[in-house]
């Protein structure tokens, strides 16, 4: 039995498109990226909201959120790169994005952004990145690594004391 929540207004799930694409990171690793957009707004040089986490072996699985509808209805491409450090691709994926390998998480996110822009799915002048908590650390890194890729970067409750975290063997 699958329960569906009622969405108020003129919501029609057929109005939205989704796709999983794969990009190649700078070290050759293939990174999955989930995309969603409004059917009437083709993903071509679109404004993009790209969000990431990539920590603690937590998977950023695709899912429905009513809060995204207004953005999608305005032609924004919503992207979630499943970067190393998360749990989407198993334990080794997580290990490749933690502690001294954390740079892979940052590089994966930037490489996904650049790949979507190079493919003309997204416009760099209208790309905004978002991440919270450990994703806030990601936002701090990408803002410094590739400021030309983002019109804005939002770090929600950022976890940014990386040195203490790397030195503490009890933290993931």
Question: Which role fits each region the language model picked out?
Answer:
Residues 36, 51-52, 130:
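Short hydrophobic segments within beta-strands
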Residues 46, 76, 149-151:
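Short beta-strand segments enriched for Tyr within beta-sheet-rich domains
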Residues 48, 72-82:
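A fold-wide structural signal in alpha/beta-hydrolase
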Residues 46, 53-58, 133:
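Active-site glycine-rich loops that stabilize anionic/oxyanionic intermediates
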Residues 31, 47, 126:
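Alpha/beta-hydrolase fold active-site loops
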